[in-house]
Amino acid sequence: MRADLRRPTGGRRRLALGAACAAALTALLVSAALAATSKTIVLTDARGDVSGTLDLTRVSMQRASDGRLRAALSFADKLTPKALLATSGPPGSACVRIWTAAGADPASMRPDRLACVTARSDDEFRGGVYEVTGPGLPKRLTGASVKLTASATSIVLRFTQSSIGRPQRFRFAIESTRPGCERPACIDTVPDGGTARTFRLR
């Protein structure tokens, strides 16, 4: 039998064209999604604007390759877990304050999520994500990974999108509080002035 060397029929051509269009559309949608996602946001803060170890100098927020959120917090001095413990009063902490509601006003509203670094002991940090629903203490929802960099002046905090409700976007600010002190002078914020930055996830 002679081999069929005829060109593809119109139906085959239409199927091939449809597949090519579908692939192009998928690539376009993926590119659009990546373009909509925020790149790394970096904020700096003046050195020496608060006293103590928890003087923030630089913070960044990004979406890591595994999909988790990655917040890097840099301080003026080296940091140890022991430096967050208090002999009296509240312990020290460094927190990402997160507003997930579309209409939230960070200048007048409390955040609804906190991703925080505290100390479990003299030699171990503790990370967690908390829900803020009222005037009481925040409710711990899940853990967050904490890593101290080689310089010991920066902490990297990683937490999942699901822990903050998978919003399309959120607003955030960073706050560190010196152990044993609740006065405004003991709190360092980035950005300053009660403002926040927007991070887009999708």
Could you describe each region identified by the protein language model?
Residues G128-G165:
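Acidic, glycine-rich flexible loop segments
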Residues A150-G194:
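Ser/Thr/Pro-rich, low-complexity mucin-like regions
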Residues R200-R202:
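Short, solvent-exposed mixed-charge patches
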Residues T37-R126, T177-R183:
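Surface-exposed, glycine/proline- and aromatic-rich loop segments on solvent-exposed faces
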Residues M1-R13:
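N-terminal secretory signal peptides that target proteins for export/translocation
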Residues A33-A35:
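Boundary at the C-terminal end of the N-terminal hydrophobic targeting segment
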Residues G18-V30:
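Bacterial N-terminal signal peptides
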